[in-house]
Amino acid sequence: MYIRYYKSNKRVLMKTIGISPHRRSFLRKAVTAGPAVALVAAAGVGVAASSNTQPAYRPAYFTAAEWATLQALVDRLIPANSDGPGALEAGVHEFIDLQMNTPYAYGKLWFMQAPFVPESPPEFGYQFHMAPRDLYRSALAGLEHAVQAKLGKAFTTLDAAQKDAVIGELEQGTLAIGAVPPKTFFGQLLQNTREGYFSDPVHGGNKDMAAWKMINFPGARADYMDWVEQYGKHYPLPPASIA
């Protein structure tokens, strides 16, 4: 599902258009008509330095091959365009890697005993026997094997259209990638990509708060009382991180 968006009275409005895995605009589903962003940030995540001073990031969890595939995937979910930075510029891949060493990724935040029903509504919580970090490890290897078998190439070497087609097959559940159902992997990847793009920069993504600037989200300021009764006025201050 992807979203076409437009602004009216300084609010982001959304209209469902159709199915397309290669449009970055469907990430706007993570943003409501107001400046609220839904996040599932895990406790204990490492703090990332400012993108202006940070040295080249080295993944703490993913192998070199997994890291390259993950970057290629998130780059196609949110490619850079005139609206704002892409996933790579925003550090989404770094956010996901940092998450892999938190209680969240180990499955410590929810009930992890059978039975699991992957088709359950989101309200029923996480529904897979692998913790997120194990899911990624299995799915990324399975994806690489499936693409090699089908196209004779590594996923990272495919052109943009081919990558989008593969991601579309994951979304539709038609590309077998081993032990992890393709739809389950796509849903996990999409959710973490949204979180990394729109989360507070303290968690490693949303570099320079670029995603917040794109949607005019004010961030984590402690006090808005000076603006409560200034109806219809543009809020002029830049977004603020919790750090």
Pin down the residues of each PLM region.
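C-terminal segment of N-terminal export signals and the immediately downstream linker at the start
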Residues: 19-25, 40-76
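Sec-dependent signal peptide hydrophobic core
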Residues: 30-38
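Short alpha-helical functional segments enriched in proximate histidine and acidic residues
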Residues: 33, 76, 196
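Short, glycine/acidic-rich hinge or "gate" loops at secondary-structure transitions
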Residues: 44, 86-91, 206-207
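Flexible, low-complexity segments enriched for small/polar residues
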Residues: 56-58, 74-186
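Long, amphipathic alpha-helical surface segments
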Residues: 175-243
